[in-house]
Amino acid sequence: MGSSNKKKKEKKKDFNKAKLKVGKAKAKAANFTDTSFKSKSIVVNQHTLAALDGVDLVGLFKQHLNQAINSKSDKLRQEALVQLTKDLSSKPIFNPVGVPNLLTKLLPLITDSVANVRTNFLKLLRALPPSDVAPHVEKILMYIRGGMTHLSTEIRSDTLSVLDWLIDVCPDETVSCPGGWLKTMNSFSSMLGWNPSVASTLSVKGWTSATKTSLNKVSKKNGEAQAKQITTLAKFLEAGFRPETPLPYDEQRYWDSIYRMPTTPNPFAYLNLWGAQRDEDGEMYPDRISRQQVFERKWRAAIKTGVMGAKQEGGVIGRAASVLDKVLRTAEEGGKKVVEEQKIEEVEEAEA
């Protein structure tokens, strides 16, 4: 009996209302947690994983690399790229897989569907040393040309930012590698709708029934995108038409170039000894004169016609077209000087 009464009292206790007395605090619950404490934290502006003991840094780098490529989570891909950028920005640079493997795996992110992933990938590219990027310009341009003709306006715009970076760090390699000159010009033609065949028809007959095909739609946002395309084209042409600065004679460098082992990969790429046969678009144009000759023959009429139309639109597009027009006029004047100098040299050689 005693035990049963005790159980009844315990059950009844759960339903009894507690009587509050003046001056006494309310009783604390059985599951009460004290949250009145204050936490202390240490903020570190910069830190590196190299300071951690017992951590497989190489394995961690490869894990971040795999996450950046294969993760289905957009946020995880962004965080992995941020961590890789930190490793590449550290001093000394921490890159256990090498730049060739890094680029091979990450270059498809140029056309990633998430804007933040593309932005963080561009930050990673900017952390790479230019000397390590130069041997891989041809491969990078292949992905850039794919992004330039993408259906998404945002992806095309971000791809142009990658091309701007490549021109900044490796201007000569960008315009002189196989396919770097004409194939990239073809991509600009697809973006802007400046077709060489249409331009030649306009110049001969004065009119044509051909329609202008462009990846840009008429809107304020796409107007800004087209202005960026024209600006990047001007930058690309400026790099291609830049006067070549002759190196002063150095006897040691002269003999080294003949007898020593080359220090750059594939130094005889211009001969194309073992590669597939190249067409005109895939050919190398290693000097300013060859680039200018093929541009005059194939692209000047189309670019001039496009610039005239862009100037008439005014606004940001018109301003960008004015910059491009200035580059074309400067290149034309420089080309005339080069031709005159060549004629003088030929005359002097003939007289000698």
Curated annotation (Swiss-Prot):
Source superkingdom: Eukaryota
Pfam name, any one: Ipi1_N
Claim: Zinc-finger is one of the keywords in the record: no
InterPro entries: ARM-like, ARM-type_fold, Ipi1_N
Subcellular locations according to the entry: Nucleus
One GO-annotated biological process of the protein: rRNA processing
Gene Ontology CC: nucleus; rixosome complex
Homology family: Belongs to the IPI1/TEX10 family.
Subunit structure: Component of the RIX1 complex, composed of rrm-9/ipi1, rix1/ipi2 and ipi3 in a 1:2:2 stoichiometry. The complex interacts (via rix1) with mdn1 (via its hexameric AAA ATPase ring) and the pre-60S ribosome particles.
Role this protein plays: Component of the RIX1 complex required for processing of ITS2 sequences from 35S pre-rRNA.
Protein name (Swiss-Prot/TrEMBL): Pre-rRNA-processing protein ipi1
Gene name linked to the record: rrm-9
